[in-house]
Design a protein with these regions (language model features):
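N-terminal Rossmann-like dinucleotide-binding module
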Residues: 1-47
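Charged/polar, solvent-exposed surface patches and flexible loops
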Residues: 41-45, 58, 109
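Beta-loop-alpha module in the N-terminal Rossmann-like domain of NAD(P)-dependent dehydrogenases
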Residues: 50-108
Length: 109
């Protein structure tokens, strides 16, 4: 059974994770989200079966999505992690998990 996931951020790291997820065959990449139009266009070409979006909230609102991959900039991760927790999603995230040590401790707490 594949794990249904939504990816947020399709820059260099998001593409790397996408590629490895594709290779593993264990993931159903349901969504790819990026605010950059060029990144969304690339995602459309590479992953035609994924829904390509610019609003990450769609991923958090979709109850069928089991996990979220957070590969956007670190300054957005604290809020994204909090949304994922509230949405009962498993979290895969690039490091660091936040852009300041104080925000990292807030996440841990």
């Amino acid at each position: 059974m594949k794990i249904k996931v939504g990816l947020i951020g399709f820059g260099r790291m998001g593409q790397m994770y996408w590629e490895e997820m594709q290779k593993s065959g264990r993931w159903d990449i349901a969504y790819i989200c990026d605010t950059d139009p060029a990144s969304r266009e690339l995602a459309r070409n590479l992953s035609p079966s994924s829904r390509i979006i610019s609003d990450e909230q769609e991923i958090f609102d979709d109850q069928s999505v089991e996990a979220v991959g957070l590969f956007a900039l670190a300054n957005s991760r604290k809020e994204q992690i909090e949304k994922a927790v509230r949405s009962n999603k498993h979290i895969l995230t690039e490091k660091p998990i936040a852009d300041t040590i104080d925000k990292e401790w807030e996440i841990v707490d």
